[in-house]
Amino acid sequence: MSALVELENLTVRLLVEGELQTVLSDVSLTIAPGEALGLVGESGSGKSMTARSIARLLPAGAEVSGAIRYDGREVGELRGRDLRAYRGDVGFVFQDPRAHVNPVRQIGDFMTEALRLHDVSRADASRRAIAALADVGVKDGERRLGQYPHELSGGLLQRVMIAATLLTEPRLLLADEPTTALDVTTQAEVMAILDELRRDRGLALLFITHDLDLAGAVCDRTAVMYAGAVVETRDSDKLHSDPLHPYTAALAVARPRVDATAERLTTIAGRSQSAYEAPPACPFSPRCPHVQDRCTEERPPLRELDGGQVRCVRAEELRGDLAVSSHG
């Protein structure tokens, strides 16, 4: 199946403390129609910046090279009506819904705003908003439209935000850690909603998270990012059982387990780095337990291996060792 979204060697530079710095480096990804792709990594790895690049929500002054293609068209070249149509095709669900709503506006106002801009009547916009709320499991939609954000729990407000994105009937949903601020039970409910919507509507989903297990539970494939670069992309089940990159294996070991005690919790040595802080060769080399001299001398390309892609010069020789270590 051809890709709906394709990123090819995407590099983004932003002003950081007055200087242009690289925040994404040669990012290459694809998402097919109806596919869920997980994007996993520590804070600062470039996950959110990748989503914002796709949505064309980068700050002023950003320098972008490489390609972002949507349905075969170069996103950076879209203007006017074509750009508006593209933005209607892309829904964005943010981590903290309260940071993206006006606290003094009723739920119905911000839900129907986009529809009203397209000359949809108030009555029809409200009807469609109520239907969208029902699709995400929110009952008594008419009453909810008259409420304010502070009257809703975090989980309920996140459902409202998902419903609002559905009103433009997007083909691509960018979910940027949409469950991080929620309790475990509500997190599972929201994930089930996203997965059901994706399957029922054929949505392409980019699901951003720091949780490797969460991505594996709902995503067909998972891409792992470190220091602004993709270091591994693979079918989710294979990535969990047989990781190709030492960083993926380290994430697998560090994930919390139900039977873990304080003495048995594992962390990744060192600290995560942004793209402009990382060394020019392998960005993970300062923290990697398998580092050799050549790892610090050359920047590995993203290359094909065993049905996936990996950015590591030692990937073939380490495979067996990484598979064992990922299971603790």
Give the residues covered by each predicted segment.
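Short catalytic/signature loops enriched in Gly
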Residues: 20, 139-145, 233-328
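A short, proline-enriched helix->beta-strand linker immediately N-terminal to the Walker B motif
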Residues: 167-171
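Conserved ABC transporter NBD signature motif
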Residues: 63-74
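ABC ATPase NBD coupling module
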Residues: 58-59, 75-91, 109, 117, ...
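P-loop NTP-binding/switch modules centered on Walker-like glycine-rich loops
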Residues: 56, 178, 182-263
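Conserved ABC ATPase signature
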Residues: 147-152, 156
